[in-house]
């Protein structure tokens, strides 16, 4: 009944008020718009193929696409993405935690390639104290940088600055002080209107 009443996201371009473009649909019902609704990319996902399977398998799986508002092209990222994909603030990347691999991944929405963000870092990004039957969650994402130039990821103690393109080496911005002294560093955003973190704030 709820599905029958469901509405789907679309857009109307400025200057073309009578042209409505449907973005989401029955096959890809969930849409996340980048840039506070004004970005180039839209993340589309669907859990529908895995609803029955989810009754015994609690791991997240979603078929995932990116819609390019400029070219009006739909690009498939994966069927399924093993996780809960999200779109970065400026919309340049789709990212997710792969609980099976215990790694963070990102899909470059512009160049259309997937990058393992944490494979070369010699610490665990998964919750080492996980005591549930399911696969462990990540410690989380602290913030993205301006224009999605970097992402800050947590391990158990420290914060890592990672280039989602993969050109710059990962940097432990807390200098391993957290792990050395068993102190947990976390980023607290005191400005609710702030969508990203600037390099000067690090």
Where in this protein do the model-derived segments appear?
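Beta-propeller folds
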Residues: 1-202
